[in-house]
UniProtKB/Swiss-Prot annotation:
Source lineage: Eukaryota, Sar, Alveolata, Apicomplexa, Conoidasida
Region feature (Disordered): 43-88, 120-162
Name of the protein this chain belongs to: Mitochondrial association factor 1 form a1
Topology term for the membrane: Single-pass type I membrane protein
Keywords: Membrane, Signal, Tachyzoite, Transmembrane, Transmembrane helix
Length: 435
């Protein structure tokens, strides 16, 4: 390393010396140029043609003497014009500048050498920490390596188990936040193999109201089709998509005519997937916000009871799924927040109203497992902080309105946006004067 720096210093030193020499040469050349360009007196211009010829001849002779090789000659008595005093002064000044410029160049090199030696003598310093610390969550029990994500708030302990927090802003209700699982990217499974309670998992669907495609909606389709294949029930992705779309469009038509009421159809009579289907609309889409901003069918929620042949893991506690559509992230803040709140009201309202039905009283839904709605394909240009804040406000409004006796579970997402949003709402609820 020192050899490299020594080569660089030698190059800089040589450059400085060359700069000084060039400065001296430039000063000499400038003075010669000035001497040659001195104008003749006005009287000479008025001389006769004969005098002009003499002047031309003598001028040529003078130029031959000036540009002849050898040391510079002094002006002879035959020179046309005497040397100007200002020219001599400029030449002397330039000759004085040359050694000064050389000395400055050498001084710069010596200063650079001194600084480099000082830095080389100091011990190496630790690199500065990044502006935003990022620490990985603890490994899942499977001991598979998990991706790192943002560090949660200081008051939130980091444990490999699901994080359970009680929120005063939600009526002293416990909320579970899942950590990374052993699956790809650490995502939470839709359903557990051996659940202790009946969980309804929310499918973040699409504006077309069908099950399938990409993302979480595609994962639901794959899970249902795999269970059907295991039980030797012929079911393709195209058939599932068409069947789910037809049922949910029929339900939405009925629910929009009766907002705030749980509507149902006996889908088990003609469906290979659903035993019974319900829909709930808290706010009719496109009445409070513009669907051209948020997307179609936002705010409607569908609750399906799956048939045993397609129930995940074959466990009857996993036979409930919820389907909803989040607003498009590029919508205006007012339209987005209103549509997001209507979506959460639809989810919690559908479960709350279902638990009041004869089927729900016998076998109620005990927990709702949610992704961070709107953070995937339909996020657009909206930031995660904005989504987390909208989610927290919507959850608080839904719990306050329906007060359901269910547990809320948020699926793992690396940014912990849902957790951060609810923690912010909790601080505002406890310390309203601080805002």
């Amino acid at each position: 390393m020192w050899r490299i720096w020594r080569c660089r210093l030698s190059f800089l030193f040589a450059t400085g010396c060359l700069l000084g020499a060039l400065t001296a040469g430039l000063g000499s050349q400038m003075s010669d140029s000035v001497g040659r360009n001195v104008q003749a007196p006005a009287g000479v211009a008025d001389a006769s043609q004969e005098a002009g010829d003499v002047v031309e001849e003598r001028t040529e002779r003078t130029e031959e003497q000036v540009f002849a090789p050898g040391p510079p000659r002094r002006h002879s008595s035959e020179s046309l014009f005497p040397r100007n005093a200002s020219v001599t002064a400029r030449r002397r000044r330039n000759r004085r500048i040359a050694p000064i410029a050389t000395a400055v160049g050498v001084a710069v090199i010596l200063a650079a050498l001194y600084v480099l030696r000082r830095r080389r003598a100091q011990p190496p310093q630790e690199p500065e920490p990044p502006t935003r610390l990022r620490t990985p969550r603890p490994r899942a029990p499977s001991e598979q390596q998990q991706p790192s994500e943002s560090e949660p708030p200081a008051e939130v302990p980091m444990t490999p188990d699901p994080l359970t927090l009680r929120f005063t802003c939600l009526g002293d209700r416990n909320v579970i936040f899942f950590g990374p699982s052993g699956r790809q990217d650490g995502f939470t499974p839709l359903y557990d193999p051996s659940p202790s309670k009946r969980v309804a998992t929310v499918d973040a669907g699409t504006y077309g109201l069908f099950i399938g495609g990409v993302g979480m909606n595609g994962e639901f389709a794959d899970t249902i089709i795999e269970e059907a294949r295991r039980n030797r029930i012929p079911l393709t992705a195209t058939e599932l998509s068409a069947e789910s779309q037809e049922i949910q469009e029929r339900l939405l038509h009925d629910a929009e005519r009766q907002p705030g009421t749980l509507v149902e159809i006996d889908s088990g009579r003609f469906s290979r997937v659903f035993a019974r289907s319900f829909a709930y609309v808290a706010i009719v889409p496109n009445t409070v916000w513009d669907e051209s901003e948020t997307g179609k069918n936002v705010g409607a929620t569908f609750l399906h009871i799956l048939k045993p042949e397609v129930t995940p893991h074959g466990n009857e506690m996993n036979d409930v799924m919820l389907y909803t559509v989040a607003p498009f992230g590029n919508a205006s803040d007012s339209a987005y927040n209103m549509a997001y709140k209507a979506t959460m009201l639809g989810i919690v309202g559908a479960v709350s109203e279902y638990n009041k039905t004869p089927w729900g009283e016998v076998k109620p839904v005990e927990a709702i497992r949610l992704p961070l709605l709107g953070a995937g394909h339909f996020r657009g240009r909206r930031g995660l902080h904005s989504i987390g804040r909208a989610n927290a406000v919507a959850v608080e409004a839904a719990i306050t309105r329906f007060d359901p006796r269910v547990e809320l579970q948020f699926m793992y997402e690396p940014s912990d946006t849902a957790l951060r949003g609810l923690m912010e709402s909790e601080r505002k609820y406890k310390f309203p004067q601080g805002d």
